Regions:
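A basic/glycine-biased coupling hinge at the interface between accessory DNA-binding modules
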Residues: 1-142, 167, 185-187, 195-198
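Short, glycine/acidic-enriched loop or turn micro-motifs at the edges of active sites
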Residues: 16, 149-150, 177
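SF2 helicase catalytic motif II
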Residues: 138-153, 170
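Conserved RecA-like helicase ATPase core segment
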Residues: 153-204
Length: 205
């Protein structure tokens, strides 16, 4: 495909597409558009500082494990309040809940986001600001997602929001090839696809 129409086609990962949205709209959430994206080492450094200031020993919980649990919470679109409500009497998760809350405060104070915030905050913008949602729904009228069986809840919610207006969504996936469950992939996203989109056309090899 050549010409002006082809220039409107964007190929991107979930995260690169969301970074583009955040650079334009993250100020709605109180961040600056020049926000920094922390990598795993940066995040663990902040987690360690939070744990130290909260009096939580690394012998009790490893910063890596805490960060992993927080990442899982973000993949499930659970903010610190949501996570705290769900921990119940689980002592380990109660401790992590305290770290999660402090961690997010420090990220915000540093105008920084971590890898899992990228999709999470984008979904928050699209959910809380109807004008932003409408803008991106019209910007992305046709959406195609590859390896759909490996999407997590946050990615599912993102795609659902963006495709809701025009309903032009194509997904490619095989429920027998899901390999990222350990990273939060939800096989139900593809198994329940036909229930969510009743007018779908199913093409198989």
């Amino acid at each position: 495909m050549l010409g002006e129409e082809a220039s409107d086609i964007r190929a991107a990962t979930f995260h690169s597409a969301c970074v583009r949205i955040l650079r334009r709209d993250i100020e709605r959430l109180g961040y600056q558009s020049s926000f920094t994206i922390y990598d795993s080492d940066d995040s663990q450094r902040v987690i360690k500082a939070c744990m130290t200031d909260l009096g939580i020993s690394e012998k009790q919980l490893s910063p890596k494990a805490v960060l992993s649990e927080i990442g899982s919470a973000k993949d499930s679109l659970l903010n610190p309040d949501d996570y705290e409500e769900r921990v119940g009497k689980d002592y380990r998760k109660t401790v992590i809940s305290r770290v999660y809350r402090e961690y997010q405060k420090r990220l915000f104070a540093s105008n920084a986001v971590d890898f899992d915030d990228i999709i999470n905050l984008t979904v928050r913008i699209l959910t809380d600001y109807p004008d932003a949602l409408e803008y991106y729904q019209n910007r992305y009228k046709y959406i195609m997602v590859d390896e759909y069986q490996d999407t997590n809840h946050a990615q599912f919610r993102l795609v659902s929001l963006l495709s809701a207006k025009h309903n032009n969504l194509c997904v490619v996936g095989d429920d027998d090839q899901s390999i990222y469950k350990f990273r939060g992939a939800t096989i139900e996203n593809i198994l329940n696809f036909e229930k969510q989109y009743l007018s779908l056309i199913h093409i198989s090899e």
